[in-house]
Amino acid sequence: MEVKTANKCYITDTKGNTYIDTSMGSGSQIIGHNNALIREVGEQIKRGTIYTIPNCHTGKVNSYLKEHINPDLDGQYIFCNSGTEANMRAIRLARAYTGKSLVGRFHGGWHGGLDGFLEEHSDNKGIPSDTNSLFRVLTYNDDQCFDKITPDMAAVIVEPVQGSNPRSDIQQFLQKLRDHCTKTRVLLIFDEVMTGFRLSAKGGAGVFNVRPDIVTYGKVLGGGFPIGAVGGKAEIMKTKNVFYGGTFSANPLSMCAAKLILETIIGMKHIQYDKLHDIGKLFRDELNKFFIAEDKKMRVVGCGPLNRIIFTDRFIRNRKDRDNFEPENAQEMFSGRLKEL
């Protein structure tokens, strides 16, 4: 299958077949394909696509993020080209600020293609074994993980809601994580690449009322264009001699799209988060009714508009439970059934 065009929530392939797009650019197209905002970016193309020096959109994007999205994080934002790059820069910043190298991350989390994030991934060939010594893997949604978060660590990075295990009952765990990181003087990084501007205008931090020291964004922020962003407390963001550069970082097209998407979110002209949460819940409820009625060992778990099919009817707390309860060939079975349709 090859996609030829996309409009609103639909994609059309080269044979003229039209489908509902349940991925929406892996979550980046929250206001739909071929929307009016993206057409405005076309005007920016006529004015130039890359200048190397700062463009007229970047300052506004920075101000919108600081004033309307994360007023608690008062430092200047750093912009790059993807969520992966944003997380790489956030880790580098945390290490530079603290003078420590060890970073905690959670099993089942996804922070992009950095070598140190891929230990558990099946496609992890070519990664030096000593890379993993700089990271400590923790168990998500399990209080025992706090014993492994120690003062010799620079930071802990976490998705407020994991894509592999999206759940709405996570506030208490996140607050305990926040408190423990404060106690041990370990920086807390929220990877909001997936949750930012999808769970709410203020992402997972806003929904669960837990504040990180550093935050990263991507996906929705670019409105369909490549983007990443790192923000944090001013004291942290002012750390000197940290390299963040990149040829296409903060390019006019991505920053124009980010400015337009933030203006839409701030004004709530099109995006209604309550409705998104209601639709997400309806999707889960109806599919779970079907799975129960058909006696299928499958369930849909989720938080707001974020949903995940799991191949077990047992309650899971984290990705570790999924690994224990799901059949080893669950994904292959699912792919096979899709091909039969």
What kind of feature is each model-predicted range?
Residues M1-L341:
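Conserved N-terminal phosphate-binding loop of PLP-dependent enzymes in the Aspartate aminotransferase
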